Each structure stands twice: as structure tokens, then as C-alpha cells.
From Swiss-Prot:
Molecular function terms, GO-annotated: adenine binding; adenine phosphoribosyltransferase activity; AMP binding
Species name: Vibrio atlanticus (strain LGP32)
Listed InterPro entries: Ade_phspho_trans (IPR005764), PRibTrfase_dom (IPR000836), PRTase-like (IPR029057), UPRTase/APRTase (IPR050054)
Predominant cellular place of this UniProt entry's protein: cytoplasm
Protein's recorded name: Adenine phosphoribosyltransferase
Length: 181
């Protein structure tokens, strides 16, 4: 992979201490998107990684997964599918709940967005626990999609989400890694 592009991307991601709560060092990808060279480098690296792999759909999770998944889908010439929180999608949906640190959350996808045999790549900004992508994987598979790959801009490997997703049979790719939570 292009180390110059990775360095540019990593340097553009601001770290915000004690957000959203004390003890968390938040990695802010919105600062990456403020830098057009870093944003383009991110999309270019994703395209270089996944072009020619035969994906028929790109799925992005709410909300920052949209910001990387949609441009990737355009570059690969495939459809983009948003996975959203309940009540945000207008057509018939299927839902999947998942556990959070304190409680549960739910994601939805249009039932007609994935057809049997679609080869799907999931994209999100950051991999921490893997709960969001695990729920997304279940939604795609429930609709008959084939999902074996998940791509992230950032991985926080100490939290263990990559291992969790590998346990679901997913190949996990991230552009850069950061220590901590």
C-alpha cells in the first residue's frame, strides 16, 4: 500500500480527548474530509484495494460509512446501499438489533436493496467493537447477499473488533490503525 498516502490520511485525522466521554480519545474522520488531498487519497486506496474483485453492491453504515462507501461505489461502478437507524428508510425494511456498551441499537436496510447472490463490500469509517458491522453482515446475509469483506478507514485493534468480524468469516481491511480506545 502507498505509505505516503497512508501518512497523509493518518496525519489528517484529529484526535479529540475525553469525547464523547472521559477517558475516550475520539478519532475524528471529519477532519480528514476537510482535506481534499487526504479524502481523495482515502478513496483512491479503497478503490485500489477492491477494484476487479467483482462486488455488485457497496453497503455503508450510518452515517460516516456513507461518506466513504458512496464515492467508492461510484468509482467501482456499482450500487451504494445505506444501512440506517430505524425509521430513516422509506421503503420496506428488515431490521437487526445489536448490543451496545449500555443497551441496544438497531439498524435497517431496504428489503429490495440486496438480491440473492449480490457480492457485497461493507464500508465504515472506524472499527472498534465490530457490533455495527456484525449487525450489517446479518442483514445482508438475511437478504441473500454474499458478504466476506469489510473496509474501514481506521481500526482500533486493542478493542478487538477485527477479531470479532474475522470470527464471522469476514476479511477485514483498514487503511490505518490507532492505539487506544
Amino acid at each position: 500500500m502507498n505509505t505516503e498516502k497512508i501518512s497523509l490520511i493518518k496525519a489528517s485525522i484529529k484526535s479529540i480527548p475525553d469525547y464523547p466521554k472521559a477517558g475516550i480519545l475520539f478519532r475524528d474522520v471529519t477532519s480528514l474530509m476537510e482535506d481534499p488531498a487526504a479524502y481523495k487519497a482515502t478513496i483512491d486506496l479503497l478503490v485500489d484495494t477492491y477494484k476487479g474483485m467483482g462486488f455488485t453492491k457497496i453497503v455503508g453504515t450510518e452515517a460516516r460509512g456513507f461518506l466513504f462507501g458512496a464515492p467508492l461505489a461510484l468509482e467501482l461502478g456499482v450500487g451504494f446501499i445505506p444501512v440506517r437507524k430505524p425509521g430513516k428508510l422509506p421503503r420496506q425494511t428488515v431490521a437487526q438489533s445489536y448490543e451496545l456498551e449500555y443497551g441496544t441499537d438497531t439498524l435497517e436496510i431496504h428489503t429490495d436493496a440486496i438480491v440473492e447472490g449480490d457480492k457485497v463490500l461493507m464500508v465504515d469509517d472506524l472499527l472498534a467493537t465490530g457490533g455495527t458491522i456484525e449487525a450489517t453482515t446479518k442483514l445482508i446475509r438475511q437478504l441473500g447477499g454474499v458478504v466476506e469483506h469489510a473496509a474501514f478507514v481506521i481500526n482500533l485493534p486493542e478493542i478487538g473488533g477485527d477479531k470479532r468480524l474475522q470470527g464471522l468469516g469476514l476479511e477485514v481491511f483498514s487503511i490505518c490503525e490507532f492505539d487506544g480506545h
